[in-house]
Structure formats: C-alpha cells, structure tokens
C-alpha cells in the first residue's frame, strides 16, 4: 500500500511547468458562480491584508499565504493524476488565464504566469491540466477569443461561464495591478 505524504506547496511549485491528468470519472467541471465568487473574495481579502500600493512587485512574495485546501496527486512512472482538487485547480487555472489576459492589455511590467497555465511538451505547448476535450475551449479563453459553445457538453459550457464570472467579480481596483 502506498504511503500518503503531505507537503505545503505554492501555486508556482504545484502548477509551474507541471502536467496533470484527470481521470475520466472526475473530468466534469461543476463549479458554479457562488464557488468562483467565494474563491475570488477569499483571495482578494487575503491579498489586501498585506497589499500596499507603494510595494514593489518583488515584495508580493513576502505576502501571507492562502490555503486552497488539500490537493491529492497520484503519481506513476510517467504521469501525475489529480485524485482530489480538480475543481479548485481548474478554477485556479481559469483565474490565471484571466490574469494573463489582463496583463496582455497593460503596458507595465508583467509577471510571466504562462508556465502556470501551460508548458512545453516536446516543443509543443499544452495545458498543465491535461483534459483533451477542454483544449479548444481553454485555448480560446487563453487567447481572449470567443468560443462557440454550440453542442458542447455541460462541463465546457461551465468552464466558459466560470471564466465570465471571474471577469464579472474580479475587483476593479485590482485590475490595473494584475
């Protein structure tokens, strides 16, 4: 029997240039507007506890952490799989895509968060959460393009809906600071 080991990780450590498969039995993304709103509110409140407008970008690394909850990963010789935490990691990826798109619109210094969203796989960029049926949708969101949801499964429609929720609930006062 395999031993379960707990480790505290940052988002960078968890998602940076990593690939995670999601087993077929838990691929449906089901978060609702309420879940996204709570996540954004929690992250915003935690961030604003430390934030000062005069802080340099590098000072953010000293800000307090927000606990996203337990995320269980199973690993074999060739692949990592998310056992628990798929909804949170998918939502976090949508938020990172949103923040990346905000940065694209700004002329100021940018933080390269793209490796948290996708990474090179033998010179081919692919998303860090490996769910092939989501690729076209995620690509459109990443590129800031409209995605035709005609005939798409509920999980894909839900992805687009939650991305739109992030756009709606993300605090205006932080959009320039993204």
What function would you assign to each model-found segment?
Residues 2-178:
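Glycine- and hydrophobic-rich flexible loops that cap the catalytic core of alpha/beta enzyme folds
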């Amino acid at each position: 029997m395999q031993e379960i080991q707990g480790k505290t990780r940052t988002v960078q450590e968890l998602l940076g240039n990593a690939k995670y498969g999601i087993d077929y039995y838990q691929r449906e993304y089901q978060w609702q507007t309420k879940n996204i709103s709570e996540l954004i509110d929690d992250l915003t409140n935690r961030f604003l506890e430390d934030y000062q407008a005069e802080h340099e970008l590098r000072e953010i690394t000293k800000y307090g952490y927000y606990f996203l909850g337990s995320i269980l990963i199973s690993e074999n010789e060739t692949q990592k799989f998310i056992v628990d935490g798929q909804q949170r990691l998918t939502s976090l990826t949508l938020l990172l895509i949103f923040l990346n798109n905000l940065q694209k619109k700004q002329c100021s210094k940018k933080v390269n968060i793209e490796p948290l969203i996708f990474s090179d796989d033998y010179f081919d960029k692919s998303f860090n959460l490996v769910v092939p049926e989501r690729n076209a949708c995620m690509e459109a969101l990443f590129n800031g393009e409209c995605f035709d949801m005609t005939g798409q499964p509920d999980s894909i429609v839900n992805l687009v809906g939650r991305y739109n929720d992030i756009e709606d609930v993300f605090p205006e006062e932080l959009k320039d600071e993204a």
